[in-house]
Amino acid sequence: MNAPRFLQLHRPDDAALAAEAAAGLLQPAAAVSPKFLYDALGSRLFDAITELDEYYPTRTEAGIFAAHGEAIAAAVRAATGPAPILVDVGAGDGTKAARLFARLQPRRYVAVDISVDYLRGALACLGREHPGIEMLGLGLDFSAGLALPGGVADEPALVFYPGSSIGNFAPAAARQLIADMRRSSCGGAVLLGVDLVKASSRLEAAYDDALGVTAAFNLNLLRRLNTLLGADFQLRQWQHVALFDAAQSRIEMHLQARVALQVRWAGGERRFEAGERIHTENSYKWTTAGFAALLAEAGFGAQCHWTDPAGDFAVFVAC
Protein backbone atom coordinates (compact mmCIF):
# COMPACT_ATOMS: atom_id res chain seq x y z
CA MET A 1 0.00 0.00 0.00
CA ASN A 2 1.26 3.47 -0.91
CA ALA A 3 0.99 5.98 1.92
CA PRO A 4 -1.53 8.78 1.29
CA ARG A 5 -0.04 12.05 0.06
CA PHE A 6 -1.20 15.45 1.28
CA LEU A 7 -0.96 18.91 -0.22
CA GLN A 8 -2.19 21.99 1.67
CA LEU A 9 -2.97 24.66 -0.92
CA HIS A 10 -5.03 26.88 1.38
CA ARG A 11 -3.54 28.15 4.62
CA PRO A 12 -6.25 29.16 7.09
CA ASP A 13 -5.50 32.65 8.38
CA ASP A 14 -7.19 33.42 11.69
CA ALA A 15 -6.65 37.16 11.26
CA ALA A 16 -8.32 37.14 7.85
CA LEU A 17 -11.17 34.96 9.14
CA ALA A 18 -11.69 37.30 12.08
CA ALA A 19 -11.78 40.33 9.78
CA GLU A 20 -14.30 38.59 7.50
CA ALA A 21 -16.55 37.64 10.43
CA ALA A 22 -16.40 41.13 11.95
CA ALA A 23 -17.26 42.72 8.60
CA GLY A 24 -20.30 40.45 8.35
CA LEU A 25 -21.51 41.41 11.81
CA LEU A 26 -21.26 45.10 10.91
CA GLN A 27 -23.36 44.89 7.73
CA PRO A 28 -26.73 46.70 7.96
CA ALA A 29 -28.33 43.23 8.03
CA ALA A 30 -25.77 41.13 9.90
CA ALA A 31 -24.66 37.99 8.06
CA VAL A 32 -21.84 35.51 8.64
CA SER A 33 -20.61 32.89 6.16
CA PRO A 34 -21.81 29.33 6.85
CA LYS A 35 -18.19 28.16 6.79
CA PHE A 36 -17.96 29.47 10.36
CA LEU A 37 -20.46 26.79 11.41
CA TYR A 38 -17.93 24.02 10.82
CA ASP A 39 -15.37 24.02 13.59
CA ALA A 40 -14.64 20.67 15.27
CA LEU A 41 -17.79 20.75 17.42
CA GLY A 42 -19.92 22.09 14.56
CA SER A 43 -18.81 19.25 12.31
CA ARG A 44 -19.77 16.68 14.96
CA LEU A 45 -23.14 18.35 15.43
CA PHE A 46 -23.76 18.25 11.68
CA ASP A 47 -22.95 14.54 11.65
CA ALA A 48 -25.64 14.12 14.32
CA ILE A 49 -28.10 16.17 12.22
CA THR A 50 -27.76 13.70 9.35
CA GLU A 51 -29.16 10.94 11.59
CA LEU A 52 -32.28 12.83 12.67
CA ASP A 53 -35.74 11.70 11.58
CA GLU A 54 -36.55 15.14 10.17
CA TYR A 55 -33.34 15.41 8.13
CA TYR A 56 -34.17 13.33 5.05
CA PRO A 57 -31.40 14.29 2.53
CA THR A 58 -28.65 11.92 3.73
CA ARG A 59 -30.72 8.75 3.89
CA THR A 60 -32.69 9.63 0.75
CA GLU A 61 -29.52 10.14 -1.28
CA ALA A 62 -28.14 6.85 0.07
CA GLY A 63 -31.36 5.15 -1.03
CA ILE A 64 -30.96 6.49 -4.57
CA PHE A 65 -27.41 5.13 -4.76
CA ALA A 66 -28.60 1.77 -3.42
CA ALA A 67 -31.45 1.55 -5.94
CA HIS A 68 -29.67 2.94 -8.99
CA GLY A 69 -25.98 2.47 -8.24
CA GLU A 70 -25.13 0.42 -11.32
CA ALA A 71 -26.92 2.80 -13.70
CA ILE A 72 -25.16 5.76 -12.09
CA ALA A 73 -21.79 4.01 -12.36
CA ALA A 74 -22.45 3.14 -16.01
CA ALA A 75 -23.21 6.78 -16.82
CA VAL A 76 -19.96 7.81 -15.14
CA ARG A 77 -17.88 5.15 -16.91
CA ALA A 78 -19.31 6.21 -20.27
CA ALA A 79 -17.76 9.64 -19.70
CA THR A 80 -14.54 8.77 -17.87
CA GLY A 81 -13.66 5.29 -19.06
CA PRO A 82 -12.62 2.54 -16.63
CA ALA A 83 -10.63 3.18 -13.44
CA PRO A 84 -11.17 6.95 -13.34
CA ILE A 85 -9.68 9.52 -11.02
CA LEU A 86 -12.30 10.32 -8.36
CA VAL A 87 -12.22 13.89 -7.00
CA ASP A 88 -14.32 14.19 -3.84
CA VAL A 89 -15.19 17.84 -3.11
CA GLY A 90 -15.85 18.56 0.56
CA ALA A 91 -14.76 15.01 1.32
CA GLY A 92 -14.96 14.97 5.11
CA ASP A 93 -14.39 11.38 6.22
CA GLY A 94 -14.73 10.05 2.67
CA THR A 95 -17.46 7.52 3.49
CA LYS A 96 -19.81 8.61 0.69
CA ALA A 97 -17.11 8.38 -1.97
CA ALA A 98 -15.95 5.02 -0.61
CA ARG A 99 -19.36 3.57 -1.49
CA LEU A 100 -18.50 4.22 -5.15
CA PHE A 101 -15.18 2.37 -5.07
CA ALA A 102 -16.55 -1.11 -5.74
CA ARG A 103 -18.41 -0.10 -8.90
CA LEU A 104 -16.02 2.53 -10.29
CA GLN A 105 -12.67 1.00 -9.26
CA PRO A 106 -10.91 4.40 -9.30
CA ARG A 107 -7.15 4.33 -9.69
CA ARG A 108 -6.77 7.55 -7.67
CA TYR A 109 -8.95 9.09 -4.96
CA VAL A 110 -8.49 12.84 -4.45
CA ALA A 111 -10.14 14.07 -1.24
CA VAL A 112 -10.63 17.86 -1.17
CA ASP A 113 -11.42 19.73 2.04
CA ILE A 114 -10.44 23.04 3.56
CA SER A 115 -7.70 21.44 5.67
CA VAL A 116 -5.70 18.27 5.16
CA ASP A 117 -5.84 17.81 8.93
CA TYR A 118 -9.48 16.75 8.45
CA LEU A 119 -8.39 14.17 5.89
CA ARG A 120 -5.40 12.40 7.41
CA GLY A 121 -7.22 9.83 9.52
CA ALA A 122 -9.84 9.16 6.86
CA LEU A 123 -7.31 8.56 4.08
CA ALA A 124 -5.13 6.38 6.29
CA CYS A 125 -8.16 4.18 6.99
CA LEU A 126 -9.34 4.14 3.36
CA GLY A 127 -5.80 3.36 2.19
CA ARG A 128 -5.68 0.27 4.40
CA GLU A 129 -9.10 -0.88 3.16
CA HIS A 130 -8.34 -0.16 -0.52
CA PRO A 131 -4.59 -0.65 -1.03
CA GLY A 132 -4.91 -0.58 -4.83
CA ILE A 133 -6.18 3.01 -4.91
CA GLU A 134 -3.75 5.92 -4.78
CA MET A 135 -4.86 8.35 -2.03
CA LEU A 136 -4.29 12.11 -2.22
CA GLY A 137 -5.59 14.74 0.21
CA LEU A 138 -5.87 18.38 -0.91
CA GLY A 139 -6.36 21.27 1.51
CA LEU A 140 -8.30 23.75 -0.60
CA ASP A 141 -10.98 26.39 0.09
CA PHE A 142 -13.17 25.64 -2.92
CA SER A 143 -15.92 28.04 -1.81
CA ALA A 144 -14.05 30.78 -3.68
CA GLY A 145 -13.41 28.57 -6.73
CA LEU A 146 -12.18 25.06 -7.51
CA ALA A 147 -8.81 24.88 -9.26
CA LEU A 148 -6.80 21.68 -8.95
CA PRO A 149 -3.01 21.74 -9.26
CA GLY A 150 -1.40 20.21 -12.32
CA GLY A 151 -1.02 16.44 -12.32
CA VAL A 152 -3.89 15.80 -9.91
CA ALA A 153 -6.58 15.13 -12.52
CA ASP A 154 -4.84 15.27 -15.90
CA GLU A 155 -7.19 12.83 -17.62
CA PRO A 156 -10.99 12.37 -17.62
CA ALA A 157 -12.08 12.29 -13.98
CA LEU A 158 -15.25 12.17 -11.90
CA VAL A 159 -15.86 15.19 -9.67
CA PHE A 160 -18.16 14.11 -6.83
CA TYR A 161 -20.16 16.61 -4.74
CA PRO A 162 -22.89 14.77 -2.82
CA GLY A 163 -25.27 15.65 -0.03
CA SER A 164 -27.01 18.71 -1.52
CA SER A 165 -24.09 20.96 -0.54
CA ILE A 166 -24.45 22.73 -3.88
CA GLY A 167 -27.56 24.27 -2.31
CA ASN A 168 -25.39 26.39 -0.01
CA PHE A 169 -24.46 28.48 -3.06
CA ALA A 170 -26.71 31.09 -4.65
CA PRO A 171 -27.58 30.15 -8.26
CA ALA A 172 -24.90 32.31 -9.90
CA ALA A 173 -22.21 31.04 -7.52
CA ALA A 174 -23.43 27.45 -7.96
CA ARG A 175 -23.19 27.82 -11.74
CA GLN A 176 -19.60 29.07 -11.41
CA LEU A 177 -18.60 26.26 -9.06
CA ILE A 178 -20.11 23.66 -11.40
CA ALA A 179 -18.22 25.25 -14.32
CA ASP A 180 -15.04 24.92 -12.22
CA MET A 181 -15.90 21.27 -11.62
CA ARG A 182 -16.37 20.76 -15.35
CA ARG A 183 -12.89 22.14 -16.03
CA SER A 184 -11.42 20.07 -13.21
CA SER A 185 -12.99 16.89 -14.61
CA CYS A 186 -10.76 17.20 -17.70
CA GLY A 187 -13.51 16.05 -20.03
CA GLY A 188 -14.98 13.56 -17.56
CA ALA A 189 -18.13 13.92 -15.48
CA VAL A 190 -19.63 15.42 -12.34
CA LEU A 191 -21.88 13.59 -9.90
CA LEU A 192 -23.97 15.83 -7.64
CA GLY A 193 -26.67 15.47 -5.00
CA VAL A 194 -29.53 17.98 -5.20
CA ASP A 195 -32.31 18.64 -2.69
CA LEU A 196 -35.63 19.27 -4.43
CA VAL A 197 -38.45 21.71 -3.70
CA LYS A 198 -41.16 20.31 -1.42
CA ALA A 199 -43.67 21.44 1.20
CA SER A 200 -42.27 24.27 3.32
CA SER A 201 -43.33 22.46 6.50
CA ARG A 202 -41.03 19.53 5.71
CA LEU A 203 -38.16 21.80 4.73
CA GLU A 204 -38.44 23.88 7.88
CA ALA A 205 -38.66 20.78 10.08
CA ALA A 206 -35.47 19.42 8.48
CA TYR A 207 -33.64 22.58 9.57
CA ASP A 208 -35.35 22.99 12.96
CA ASP A 209 -35.62 19.52 14.47
CA ALA A 210 -37.53 18.61 17.62
CA LEU A 211 -34.38 17.57 19.51
CA GLY A 212 -32.77 20.95 18.92
CA VAL A 213 -29.60 19.57 17.34
CA THR A 214 -29.75 22.02 14.42
CA ALA A 215 -30.35 24.84 16.89
CA ALA A 216 -27.19 23.81 18.76
CA PHE A 217 -25.30 23.62 15.45
CA ASN A 218 -26.34 27.18 14.59
CA LEU A 219 -25.75 28.60 18.09
CA ASN A 220 -22.28 27.04 18.11
CA LEU A 221 -21.37 29.67 15.50
CA LEU A 222 -21.53 32.28 18.29
CA ARG A 223 -19.16 30.18 20.37
CA ARG A 224 -16.81 30.09 17.39
CA LEU A 225 -17.03 33.89 17.03
CA ASN A 226 -16.28 34.34 20.73
CA THR A 227 -13.06 32.39 20.24
CA LEU A 228 -12.11 33.89 16.89
CA LEU A 229 -12.95 37.53 17.66
CA GLY A 230 -12.70 37.62 21.43
CA ALA A 231 -16.42 38.49 21.36
CA ASP A 232 -18.85 38.30 24.28
CA PHE A 233 -21.89 36.65 22.72
CA GLN A 234 -24.12 35.08 25.40
CA LEU A 235 -25.64 32.05 23.72
CA ARG A 236 -28.78 32.01 25.89
CA GLN A 237 -29.67 35.47 24.55
CA TRP A 238 -30.12 34.06 21.05
CA GLN A 239 -32.45 31.60 19.37
CA HIS A 240 -32.27 29.55 16.18
CA VAL A 241 -34.68 30.44 13.37
CA ALA A 242 -35.23 28.44 10.15
CA LEU A 243 -37.66 29.59 7.47
CA PHE A 244 -38.39 28.90 3.81
CA ASP A 245 -38.30 31.84 1.40
CA ALA A 246 -40.51 30.62 -1.44
CA ALA A 247 -39.63 33.55 -3.70
CA GLN A 248 -35.94 32.58 -3.65
CA SER A 249 -36.57 28.84 -3.21
CA ARG A 250 -34.28 28.60 -0.23
CA ILE A 251 -34.22 27.68 3.44
CA GLU A 252 -32.62 30.40 5.55
CA MET A 253 -31.03 29.92 8.95
CA HIS A 254 -30.73 32.86 11.32
CA LEU A 255 -29.79 33.59 14.91
CA GLN A 256 -32.31 35.96 16.48
CA ALA A 257 -31.70 38.14 19.54
CA ARG A 258 -34.17 37.34 22.33
CA VAL A 259 -33.59 40.74 23.97
CA ALA A 260 -31.91 44.02 23.08
CA LEU A 261 -28.18 43.56 23.65
CA GLN A 262 -24.71 44.88 22.90
CA VAL A 263 -21.97 42.60 21.56
CA ARG A 264 -18.33 43.63 21.81
CA TRP A 265 -15.19 42.16 20.32
CA ALA A 266 -11.60 43.22 19.82
CA GLY A 267 -11.82 46.32 17.63
CA GLY A 268 -15.59 46.50 17.29
CA GLU A 269 -19.08 46.27 18.72
CA ARG A 270 -22.71 46.21 17.64
CA ARG A 271 -26.07 46.70 19.25
CA PHE A 272 -28.81 44.22 18.34
CA GLU A 273 -32.43 45.02 19.04
CA ALA A 274 -34.79 42.30 20.27
CA GLY A 275 -35.81 40.24 17.24
CA GLU A 276 -32.85 41.36 15.11
CA ARG A 277 -31.10 38.54 13.28
CA ILE A 278 -27.74 37.31 12.08
CA HIS A 279 -28.14 35.42 8.78
CA THR A 280 -25.96 32.29 8.96
CA GLU A 281 -26.86 29.98 6.07
CA ASN A 282 -28.93 29.50 2.93
CA SER A 283 -29.86 26.18 1.36
CA TYR A 284 -31.36 26.55 -2.12
CA LYS A 285 -33.87 23.95 -3.30
CA TRP A 286 -34.25 23.04 -6.96
CA THR A 287 -36.64 21.41 -9.39
CA THR A 288 -35.06 18.77 -11.64
CA ALA A 289 -35.75 20.98 -14.68
CA GLY A 290 -34.23 24.02 -13.00
CA PHE A 291 -31.06 22.18 -12.01
CA ALA A 292 -30.74 20.62 -15.47
CA ALA A 293 -30.85 24.15 -16.90
CA LEU A 294 -28.14 25.23 -14.44
CA LEU A 295 -25.90 22.37 -15.59
CA ALA A 296 -26.43 23.40 -19.21
CA GLU A 297 -25.52 27.00 -18.35
CA ALA A 298 -22.32 25.71 -16.73
CA GLY A 299 -21.34 24.05 -20.01
CA PHE A 300 -22.57 20.46 -19.73
CA GLY A 301 -24.11 19.03 -22.88
CA ALA A 302 -25.27 15.64 -21.59
CA GLN A 303 -26.88 14.77 -18.29
CA CYS A 304 -29.16 12.29 -16.56
CA HIS A 305 -30.67 12.07 -13.11
CA TRP A 306 -32.36 9.71 -10.66
CA THR A 307 -34.77 10.49 -7.83
CA ASP A 308 -36.32 8.66 -4.90
CA PRO A 309 -39.96 7.51 -5.32
CA ALA A 310 -41.28 10.55 -3.43
CA GLY A 311 -39.28 13.00 -5.53
CA ASP A 312 -37.56 14.54 -2.51
CA PHE A 313 -33.98 14.36 -3.79
CA ALA A 314 -32.07 13.86 -7.04
CA VAL A 315 -28.66 12.59 -8.09
CA PHE A 316 -27.33 14.08 -11.34
CA VAL A 317 -24.54 12.88 -13.64
CA ALA A 318 -23.40 15.43 -16.23
CA CYS A 319 -20.63 15.31 -18.80
Briefly describe each language-model feature range:
Residues 93-105:
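Conserved SAM-binding loop of SAM-dependent methyltransferases across substrates and taxa
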Residues 1-36, 43:
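N-terminal auxiliary segments of SAM/dcSAM-dependent transferases
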Residues 102-145:
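Class I SAM-dependent methyltransferase SAM/SAH-binding core
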Residues 175-187:
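A short glycine-rich, Lys/Arg-flanked "PGG" loop and its adjoining helix->strand segment in the class I
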